[in-house]
């Protein structure tokens, strides 16, 4: 599973489009702000792949420079690092916006051929950089020169400015992207039959949500995770985990129970008909074979001449349905019996 981050950032639709949009925006001469949450998966790999996309888009025209966000004066930092001494000597600090106006108007500075990537900015630092970048593009008046990629946290509160677009990882990547990734990873790397792999993917999706990096670790552990999810989900309460397990089982197990019921009724329809109408202990009467639920069939056919294996299967499926119907969860052993 060494290449699992590559699958996420290159093949999963939402994640790939997130990087493509950023790269296209920057290649078009605009700047970008990317908002990343604490759950943004494989951050270093994301940066590496995005840099690769950018280099292909730039085609050698622009160089990417990593810049520290930790500065009180972004304009002065850019001025000091991307202007030659001769250019600096011509600068006259005439007002608050003098630095940024000077940078936007000069045609002979390294900034014009650069993409400045500002990483790990706090909210306060990001606000200063965003204001500087927006002013820079305003003074450019539509011309294409230097561009900026500002990386900050998910709690960003600003909106797009002219030629400065904000991209949010949480907005661009959906629950379905995470689910599709989990299904793919479980199918490729999980163990067991197709039902067990699907169950693993569903349960991981229901317990880890958008935290796909944690989800991938759970899938990697496979059977150990299915036996004891709480061991891998320290940040989830017992109630949250039980609810996720029940939701997963309801989605996957209930249809299989209904398929079993229909097949069972079809196989034993003459025998069932011979016992009808049948009054249950609840007072409910069964008049047709297809009206009988699993528990009803167990009552109707009790003591009849059924194949032992079929009788055991009926009991297993009846018990499973009763548990799920009463908001209880099945053990992994119970689930595997149904899948079998």
Ranges and model annotations:
Residues 36-39, 63-73:
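A short hydrophobic beta-strand->loop->alpha-helix junction that borders the nucleotide-binding pocket
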Residues 26, 45-48, 78, 106:
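Terminal accessory regions of large proteins
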Residues 47, 73-75, 339:
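Short alpha-helical interface elements
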Residues 13-16, 20-30, 37-40, 56-59, ...:
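Amphipathic alpha-helical interface elements
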Residues 1-17:
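Dynamic helix-loop-helix/coil hinge segments at AAA+ ATPase domain boundaries and subdomain interfaces
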Residues 42-61:
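P-loop NTPase Walker A phosphate-binding motif
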